[in-house]
Every structure is written in structure tokens, then in C-alpha cells.
Curated annotation (Swiss-Prot), chain A:
UniProt-listed Pfam families: Abhydrolase_1
Subunit: Homodimer.
GO MF terms, alphabetically ordered: homoserine O-acetyltransferase activity; homoserine O-succinyltransferase activity
Gene3D superfamilies in the record: 1.10.1740.110, alpha/beta hydrolase (3.40.50.1820)
Catalytic activity: L-homoserine + succinyl-CoA = O-succinyl-L-homoserine + CoA
Site feature: Important for acyl-CoA specificity: 324
Functional note: Transfers a succinyl group from succinyl-CoA to L-homoserine, forming succinyl-L-homoserine.
Name recorded for this polypeptide: Homoserine O-succinyltransferase
GO CC annotation: cytoplasm
């Protein structure tokens, strides 16, 4: 809880809701006749509407990327370390938009929303949405806000996939793309992890084939287990070792299945805390969006061919201990962009935090991000002059 | 701009694809992108240099050249450059092979250890030369291979590498007739334009 709002915070922010009544055709063949997107904005849009940055969130992110909703909030938004006045994504220079993606559970239309056609909650019947669908819906939000071209679109992990899709689908609608700790498609191992996460949810007897709210139930065990698994893969072996080692709960072994090691307690806590703020159907949808993303499939697996459509400048960032989206995966994108002759810079940041590093204010990471975006901002001001 | 870079600039055709290995703060690449409209990329591992490149808008990739260049396809660049860096890599001979695999042509510049002052320093003082241009001690120098103008020429001959042209300049990076006539003795920086 902040006693006072820090000087480099965007302060108290209020989410807004955009209503869309033009049907959105989805990759799966279904369409959404109407839907809502919840979003927040930080900073001021300039007169030519050229200084907007779109933030794309990852698996469990939402529209609350920076600042506080109330003075009683225990924590600021999920990327507050990077977004704010004077920060890497400088709200003195940019108008920053963060939204909750379709299928989410934080205010945008998703499985917990009411299906207007039935008057019932969507739950299991909510169609599977893809990265492509998200980007389409984000473009409509941009239209609504009067933004033709983004100065930059920024995202980490699954968010980075959305940025990549933007660069291919709407090449003239962004000047620069920042893709952090991401990949051009999931590896087999990553799909496998997602399947274990989904199975742990689906096999929870409280899941009721996805219609758990109707059954006054919450699949906390399954969702918690999925989050525990995810959490292990977001951290590096070293980071976990440094944090917990073999620290014990008791002075000696208890020889039972209670908590012996502190890491067990930590994981259980993380799993349980997650079930209080996240919806299991949304989690399943997000993992499917990850699995399906593969823009190179449009060009017979040739990533550089599909990226030849892009026109923006790219910055790619990876982290040395990230094994869920390893530096090699970012380098696949880098190499394809070089092959296609696109403007790209790439930084491989030394970090101990594993995949989670993309959420940490690692000094060199923030410097690289800030340097790249400062140039984007400077170019905007020279263009206006 | 350093005059060895000016010489390179004269040799580079406009609108080509250029890869600059160990590009440092991107001085040459910046110039080539602005004035020759090349599609250029730099490789670098120095954090400050990388940042300067990003600041200037020079496409730069953080990649350790000693760990290989397999990510670049055969003949995928018109020109591969390396200025004042070849002496810093583990296997300069294999690196030249790689450069010629990736690039149709290469331009390499290096400090000529056969310069008379280096020879005199070693001959009279009996100690490894330390100069303004190579200001390191033997134990902390990043320059782990020292070679001369002639050594490089010989390597090219052994590998059947064509020397398209060369230049040799002194400490002030000026071109004089005596340097041109005896480059191994008088040049401090050698510049080679090579191909297969």
C-alpha cells in the first residue's frame, strides 16, 4: 500500500470499457457479435495521435499495467517498474494503452461474461481465441481511440507474440515493435507444459467441463496445480536455488507429505493465490492461444518470408537464464528479420530470474528499452517540427 | 571519421547488404547506412557500444563472434566487414573462412605488428610493444593474435583468397608513397579487400 504515490508512478488510474457491436470473426470459425474490452491509459495523447504505445500482456496479465486503482492497493500494476514518468516507457513522452485481451477474466469479454445471445455466462462455450483475434480486436480499440499508427507496440512472452503478429498483420500501423522474451512459435516442450496445465484443470472434479460457476464450484486444485507448474518454468534453477535452497520448515524431517521444504510452501501459496484472481477457463484459453501461434505456417514454415511484410523497426530482448522462452527462440526471430532485411536490434540480458526476468527492472534491460524508445520519441518530435 | 574508415567508405558500393563484425559504437556502419543507404547490421557484445548503436538507430545484434556465425546463411551479405578486431578472436583463420562464406566480399583492417616501431621496441627494449594505438600490456590485452601485413598476405595465398585491393596507412592514418612501397615496415593499419 503506498502512503504517498511515488513521483515516478502514473498515480491513481481508472480503467475504461470500450463496447464493440461490430461482429468479430474469430480464427476458430465462430464470431463474437458484440464484446467489451477493458483498458487503461497513462500519459497524454499528442495532437497528431502519433505518440501511442500499446502494451500487450502475457498469459496471466491484464489491463492494469501501471499505477494504483486506490490508495489501499497492496501492489501497483504488473509492469509498473517499466511504465511511468521518467521510466523506460516514459509516460511524459508517450500515451500508453494497456488492455485485457478477449477471453480474459479481468473485465474484457471472456468465459465469465454473459453471452448476450443466451443470457447465460459463457463459461465453457466461450470460443477459443487466438493471437490473431486479439490483434484484430486491439486494432479496433486503436480505431476507437483515434490511433492510426502506434509509435511502438511492446510485449513480453505471449505479449511479444501479439507484437510480432501486429508487425505482420498491420505493417503500417506501428513504427516500432519491442518483443521481449518471446518466440515465433512454441516449442514442443512448451506445448507439453501447457497440456499438463490444462489436464490438471480439466481433471479437477470441480471443473465440471468448464461450467463450474453454474455448478457453484471453482476448480482451485486444478488451476493451482497448473500455476505451480507454470511457476517452476518461469524461474531458473539458480533463482529457485538462491531463493529457497533446501530450507526446511521444521528442524528435522517429518517423514510425511506435509510441507518439508520451503519451496513447497511457496509453490502452494503461489498456486492458491492465483486461483483467487484468475479464471480457469481463461487460463485454458490463454494456453491454447500460445500453442496455436505460428505465423510462419502461412509461408510454409519460412519465418523470414512472412516477416518480409513488416515495415517497423524491431527491438528484441532475451534473458540468459530464461528456459521457457530461451534466447535461442528470440534469435530465431532476429535471424529471420535479418534475412528479410528488416531493421532489428537485439540484446541478450544477463539475468538470474529466468523467464520472469521480463517483469523485473533489471538495469541494463531498462536502459536498452529506454534507449530504443527515446529514439522513437525523438523522431516523433522532429517529425512534428 | 578515422581515415581507415574513409578508405573503406570509398570501396563500398551503395545499397548493398553489409554485416559489420565487432562494430563497436557503429561509426562506420552509421556512415554507410546514412550515405550509402546500405542494409547494414552490426554484431557487438560490448554493452555500452550496443547501447550507442541503438541510440543512433543502427541495427545491432548482441552476438559473440567466437561462439560462431552459423546463424548467417552462405553468401547472404554482399560485404562482411571487420575493422581492428581480427586479432581479438580465437581463430582468425577460421573466422576469415566464415566471413567469406557469409559475404561475397570482405574488408578487414588490422594493426600491422611488423611496423618498424614495434620491431624497434621489441629489439631494443626486449619487451612487448605498447603504443598509443595498441595501449595494452601483454597480460590484459584483448589482442590475442599479433600478425603482420605479410602474415596476412601469406594466409590469403595459402587459402586461395583473392586480394581485390589493399591499402596501408600510418599512425595518423595517412597514405604515403613509402608506406605503399614497404607496407610491412611502414603501415600501422592494413586494410584488405578480399573475396574467394
Amino acid at each position: 500500500m503506498p502512503d504517498v504515490i511515488p513521483a515516478d508512478s502514473v498515480g491513481i488510474v481508472t480503467p475504461q470499457i470500450a463496447q464493440f457491436d461490430t461482429p468479430l470473426a474469430l480464427s476458430c470459425g465462430q464470431s463474437l457479435s458484440s464484446y467489451q474490452l477493458i483498458y487503461e491509459t497513462y500519459g497524454t495523447l499528442n495532437q497528431s495521435a502519433s505518440n501511442a504505445i500499446l502494451i500487450c500482456h502475457a498469459l496471466s496479465g491484464d489491463h492494469h499495467a501501471a499505477g494504483y486503482h486506490a490508495m489501499s492497493d497492496s501492489k501497483p500494476g504488473w509492469w509498473d517498474t517499466a511504465i511511468g514518468p521518467g521510466k523506460a516507457i516514459d509516460t511524459n513522452k508517450f500515451f500508453v494503452i494497456a488492455l485485457n485481451n478477449l477471453g480474459g477474466c479481468c473485465g474484457s469479454t471472456g468465459p465469465t461474461s454473459i453471452n448476450p445471445e443466451t443470457g447465460q455466462r459463457w463459461e465453457a462455450s466461450f470460443p477459443i481465441v487466438t493471437v490473431e483475434d486479439w490483434v484484430e480486436s486491439q486494432a479496433r480499440l486503436a480505431d476507437l481511440l483515434g490511433i492510426q499508427t502506434f509509435a511502438a507496440i511492446v510485449g513480453g512472452s505471449l505479449g511479444g507474440m501479439q507484437v510480432l503478429e501486429w508487425s505482420i498483420r498491420f505493417p503500417t500501423r506501428l513504427q516500432s515493435a519491442v518483443i521481449v522474451a518471446s518466440a515465433p512459435k512454441l516449442s514442443t516442450q512448451n506445448i507439453a507444459f501447457n497440456e499438463v496445465a490444462r489436464q490438471s484443470i480439466r481433471r479437477d472434479p470441480d471443473f465440471f467441463d468448464g461450467n463450474y460457476i453454474d455448478n457453484n464450484s471453482v476448480p482451485t486444485n486444478g488451476l493451482g496445480l497448473a500455476r505451480m507448474l507454470g511457476h517452476i518454468t518461469y524461474l531458473s534453477d539458480d533463482a529457485m536455488g538462491a531463493k529457497f535452497g533446501r530450507q526446511m520448515r521444521h528442524d528435522s524431517y517429518q517423514y510425511n507429505y506435509g510441507i518439508e521444504f520451503e519451496v513447497e510452501s511457496y509453490l502452494r501459496y503461489q498456486g492458491e493465490a492465483f486461483t483467487k484472481r484468475f479464471d480457469a477457463n481463461t487460463y485454458m484459453l490463454m494456453t491454447k492461444a500460445l500453442d496455436y501461434f505460428d505465423p510462419a505456417s502461412q509461408t510454409n514454415g519460412d519465418l523470414s518470408a512472412v516477416l518480409s511484410r513488416a515495415q517497423c523497426e524491431f527491438l528484441l530482448v532475451s534473458f540468459t537464464t530464461d528456459w521457457r522462452f530461451s534466447p535461442e527462440r528470440s534469435e530465431e526471430i532476429v535471424n529471420a528479420l535479418v534475412k528479410a532485411g528488416k531493421s532489428v536490434s537485439y540484446a541478450k540480458i544477463e539475468a538470474t530470474e529466468g523467464h520472469d526476468a521480463f517483469l523485473f527492472p533489471i538495469p541494463r534491460y531498462m536502459t536498452v528499452l529506454n534507449t530504443f524508445l527515446t529514439r522513437v520519441a525523438n523522431r516523433l518530435t522532429t517529425e512534428i517540427k | 571519421m578515422r581515415s581507415d574508415l574513409e578508405i573503406i567508405d570509398e570501396w563500398v558500393q551503395p545499397n548493398i547488404r553489409v554485416l559489420d563484425l565487432a562494430c563497436g559504437p557503429g561509426e562506420l556502419l552509421h556512415h554507410l547506412i546514412k550515405n550509402k543507404q546500405v542494409n547494414g547490421y552490426g554484431l557487438e557484445i560490448g554493452h555500452d557500444d550496443l547501447n550507442i548503436c541503438i541510440e543512433k538507430g543502427i541495427p545491432v545484434l548482441e552476438q559473440n563472434i567466437d561462439e560462431g556465425l552459423q546463424n548467417f546463411d552462405d553468401q547472404s551479405f554482399d560485404l562482411v566487414l571487420m575493422t581492428h578486431a581480427l586479432q581479438q578472436f580465437r581463430r582468425p583463420d577460421l573466422l576469415i573462412d566464415e566471413m567469406l562464406r557469409i559475404g561475397k566480399e570482405c574488408i578487414i583492417t588490422f594493426p600491422n605488428f611488423g611496423h618498424w616501431r614495434s620491431r624497434l621496441h621489441l629489439a631494443l627494449k626486449g619487451r612487448m610493444p605498447v603504443s598509443d594505438f595498441l595501449p595494452y600490456n601483454w597480460y590484459d590485452t584483448p589482442n590475442i593474435h599479433f600478425f603482420t601485413f605479410q602474415d596476412f598476405e601469406r594466409l590469403c595465398k595459402e587459402k586461395n583468397i583473392k586480394v581485390l585491393r589493399w591499402a596501408a596507412v600510418d599512425g595518423q592514418l595517412k597514405d604515403h608513397w613509402w608506406i605503399r612501397s614497404m607496407p610491412n615496415l611502414f603501415s600501422e593499419t592494413a586494410i584488405f579487400h578480399i573475396s574467394r
